[in-house]
UniProtKB/Swiss-Prot annotation:
<protein>
    <recommendedName>
        <fullName>Translationally-controlled tumor protein homolog</fullName>
    </recommendedName>
</protein>
<dbReference type="GO" id="GO:0002181">
    <property type="term" value="P:cytoplasmic translation"/>
</dbReference>
<keyword id="KW-0648">Protein biosynthesis</keyword>
<keyword id="KW-0493">Microtubule</keyword>
<keyword id="KW-0963">Cytoplasm</keyword>
<keyword id="KW-0206">Cytoskeleton</keyword>
<dbReference type="Pfam" id="PF00838">
    <property type="entry name" value="TCTP"/>
</dbReference>
<dbReference type="GO" id="GO:0005829">
    <property type="term" value="C:cytosol"/>
</dbReference>
<dbReference type="InterPro" id="IPR018103">
    <property type="entry name" value="Translation_control_tumour_CS"/>
</dbReference>
<dbReference type="InterPro" id="IPR018105">
    <property type="entry name" value="Translational_control_tumour_p"/>
</dbReference>
<dbReference type="InterPro" id="IPR011057">
    <property type="entry name" value="Mss4-like_sf"/>
</dbReference>
<feature type="domain" description="TCTP">
    <location>
        <begin position="1"/>
        <end position="169"/>
    </location>
</feature>
<keyword id="KW-0020">Allergen</keyword>
<dbReference type="GO" id="GO:0005874">
    <property type="term" value="C:microtubule"/>
</dbReference>
<comment type="similarity">
    <text>Belongs to the TCTP family.</text>
</comment>
<dbReference type="InterPro" id="IPR034737">
    <property type="entry name" value="TCTP"/>
</dbReference>
<dbReference type="GO" id="GO:0007026">
    <property type="term" value="P:negative regulation of microtubule depolymerization"/>
</dbReference>
Length: 169
């Protein structure tokens, strides 16, 4: 199994157990599912029907997005201007990371061109996205984007391909 970590923070972002689709050569998208966590009730007595029913047990159950829950991502917020400011700094950091890894100029130029194009897509649909940081909540790390498919039901995440490094487990 491969786990993809943020190259800037080391936070685990996603794994290959999700069907990652490369989009425009610059991001991965992965469909998610909604899961229910919490709300479990365990009867420990011999006669469960005679025990008092605990009220409110169902209230503690929450619906979460599996990727967000599994990788302990934290919701954050942005306005359009704030996101653009963040994205500019993040792209520079990823570009520097590519240089440190020894990427050639053509690869870096390709990344810049494709990232700029995809950023325009994000901004044009900005109001549709939810934003998540990695577990460390480091503001310089990757912001994972959550949106819903055209059916309005299926959530999916978008992560920057060049901002990830593989870790085999």
């Amino acid at each position: 199994m491969l786990i993809y970590k943020d190259i800037l923070t080391g936070d685990e972002i996603i794994s290959d157990s999700y069907n990652l689709k490369e989009i425009d050569g610059v991001v991965y998208e992965a469909d998610c599912t909604k899961i229910t966590v919490g709300g479990e009730s365990f009867d420990t007595g011999a006669n469960a029907s005679a025990e008092e029913q605990e009220e409110g047990a169902e209230d503690s159950a929450e619906t979460k997005i599996d990727v967000v829950y599994s990788f302990r991502l934290n919701e954050t917020g942005f306005d359009k201007k704030g996101y653009l400011t963040y994205l500019k700094g993040y792209m520079k950091a990823v570009k520097d990371g590519l240089k440190k890894k020894g990427a050639d100029e053509a690869t870096i130029k390709d990344f810049e061109t494709k990232a700029s194009g995809y950023a325009k897509k994000i901004i044009s649909n900005f109001k549709d996205y939810e934003f998540f940081t990695g577990e460390s909540m480091n503001p310089d790390g990757m912001i994972v984007l959550l949106n819903y498919r055209e059916d309005g039901v299926t959530p999916y995440v978008t992560v920057w391909k060049h901002g990830l490094e593989e870790m085999k487990v």
